[in-house]
């Protein structure tokens, strides 16, 4: 059937949007958590599942002294249970990733990066001790308060890191503050967020190049720079694919970030549409 009109409502707070969905004042809402989808049930809504096509991760400021050490960053990767985050927030429907690329990028995606780290708190403790942080260290995770999936993920991560001696403080800020202080200013220690990209593989990976304007993480790895530039400048597609995959493995093994998942996109659609 045709529709007489379509109204788009822009609601800054996710929880407020969900309340409106339950009240029937909106008919379609994306980015539900698994708990929200379960709360709705199936009497009035259909739940449609897709992918957000995001690299959901805890991004690290490599200029912050403990995080400047590869062993410390690797320890955080071992300390975070990606499956626990996926199961709790997205009902196990997300795709676990291990580098800054999503599966939808097809031939450019390196699946081997997914298994570089497994959940291993004891290994995390060993690496922290080797790096000179046997007693742990303090870490502030800044997260935009308007995105529940990022806040919930950060809370799980904080609990998991506490088990290996890392004392986490959560700093929830407004989205505008996050953009100004974290993304534009690079003034943070760690942050939980999701990044999207275009169909060009370079768009996903360029932000890790040492002198890139979007490298808010202050990440620097000369091998990565060389591999990325080879992929970016070559006209040979086989060489391009090979080096973009190699770049992903460098990010994974060097623990440039704690990569978590390409989150499931759960969309509620009112059954009034059939």
Give the residues covered by each predicted segment.
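A bilobed periplasmic-binding-protein/Venus flytrap-type ligand-binding module shared by bacterial periplasmic
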Residues: 52-75, 79, 88, 263-264
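Ligand-site clamp/hinge motif
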Residues: 1-38, 167
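Structural transition elements
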Residues: 96-130, 147-150
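Short, well-ordered beta-strand elements
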Residues: 3-9, 136-145, 168-171, 189
């Amino acid at each position: 059937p045709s529709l007489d009109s379509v109204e788009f409502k822009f609601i800054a707070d996710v929880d407020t949007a969900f309340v409106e969905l339950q009240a029937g004042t909106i008919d379609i809402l994306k980015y539900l958590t698994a708990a929200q989808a379960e709360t709705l049930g199936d009497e009035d809504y259909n739940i449609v599942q897709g992918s957000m096509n995001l690299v959901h991760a805890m991004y690290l400021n490599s200029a912050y002294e403990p995080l400047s050490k590869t062993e410390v960053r690797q320890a955080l990767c071992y300390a975070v249970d990606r499956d626990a985050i996926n199961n709790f927030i997205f009902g196990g429907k997300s795709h676990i990733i291990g580098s800054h690329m999503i599966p939808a990028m097809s031939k450019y995606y390196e699946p081997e990066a997914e298994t570089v780290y497994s959940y291993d708190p004891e290994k995390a403790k060993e690496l922290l001790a080797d790096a000179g942080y046997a007693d742990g260290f303090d870490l502030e995770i800044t997260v935009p308060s308007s995105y529940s999936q990022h806040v919930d993920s950060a809370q799980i991560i904080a609990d998991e890191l506490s088990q290996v001696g890392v004392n986490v403080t959560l700093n929830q800020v407004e989205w505008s503050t996050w953009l100004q202080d974290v993304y534009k200013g690079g003034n943070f220690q760690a942050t939980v967020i999701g990044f999207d990209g275009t169909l060009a593989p370079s768009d996903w990976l360029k932000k890790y190049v040492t002198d890139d304007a979007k490298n808010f993480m202050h990440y620097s790895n000369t091998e990565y720079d060389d591999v990325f530039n080879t992929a970016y400048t070559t006209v040979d597609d086989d060489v391009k694919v090979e080096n973009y995959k190699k770049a992903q493995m460098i990010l994974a093994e060097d623990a440039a970030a704690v990569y978590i998942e390409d989150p499931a996109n759960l969309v509620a659609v009112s059954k009034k549409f059939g």
